Swiss-Prot record:
Region called Disordered, residue ranges: 1-24
Quaternary structure and partners: Part of the 50S ribosomal subunit. Binds 23S rRNA.
GO CC annotation, single: ribonucleoprotein complex
Keywords: Ribonucleoprotein, Ribosomal protein, RNA-binding, rRNA-binding
A GO molecular-function annotation: structural constituent of ribosome
Entries under HAMAP family matching the protein: Ribosomal_eL20
GO biological process: translation
UniProt entry tagged with the keyword Ribosomal protein: yes
Originating organism: Haloarcula marismortui (strain ATCC 43049 / DSM 3752 / JCM 8966 / VKM B-1809)
The protein's name: Large ribosomal subunit protein eL20
Superkingdom as given in the UniProt entry: Archaea
Length: 56
């Protein structure tokens, strides 16, 4: 599996919160899905509230 860096933002109390997270995944699509899953469970966000800007 490769390591991907996912960058994006989500709404927080003080405005948009930027994030950069490294994820191990077989491809970019799976890395993106894992970020949606992790941030959804940790921050109680829906997928539509998370904006992913780049997967590298």
């Amino acid at each position: 599996m490769s390591t991907y860096t996912v960058r994006g933002s989500f709404p927080a109390r003080d405005g948009p919160q930027q994030f950069e997270k490294e994820v191990e995944a077989p491809n970019e699509n799976v890395a993106e899905e894992r970020v949606y899953s992790d941030f959804g469970s940790q921050h109680n966000l829906k997928r539509t509230q998370i904006t992913i800007e780049e997967v590298a």
